[in-house]
Amino acid sequence: CNGDAKEAEKFLKEKGLAAVEKRASRATSEGIIVVKTANAKAVMAELTCETDFVAKNADFIAVGDKIAETALAKGYTDVQKELSDMVLDLATRVRENMGLRRLTAVQAGSDEYIAHYVVIVVLKSDKPDALADKAFQEFAYDCCLHAAAFTPLYVKKEDVDAAYIDEQLEVFRGQVAELQKPDNVKEGIVKGKLSKHLAEICF
């Protein structure tokens, strides 16, 4: 580049982007989810990469934090070029395919509280004072943990369709059919299995 620093920088950047394009077809099955909250608003960003090693890399995690913080500060509700470019910049330095797959934002109302743990949960209360209550906030966080662990489908057990419960009972009875135990004991095991299953799919 004949000693021209700007030309050298441009050359290196173009070379880096060309390398990124070559890696674009590689599968990105690893990654991280970053959640940031402020002023009753939450932003969730999903960054993907090829390997678990990069997913745990401090620079990769820092980019995820920066993306979520920028989206939160600027009011972005989906993927923007400014955010994608942050990942692209890292990809030119780390020889691995990576990207910003998704980004979403949630704004809580005046009667709502946002909690997060890999997932975002918004709880609503008709009592404004409850939103600042420690027990209420801990409950919201517990809901996040439950959602992350089990991906529940219903709010409460009463919401579960009766036909679905009958199907599960049939499955569980099939599982204990060969046990050398009295029928009443088998039925107790079935009820226990159903109770555990409902606890997982409901909040």
Task: Name the predicted role of every residue range.
Residues 1-203:
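N-terminal assembly/interaction segments in proteins that build large macromolecular machines
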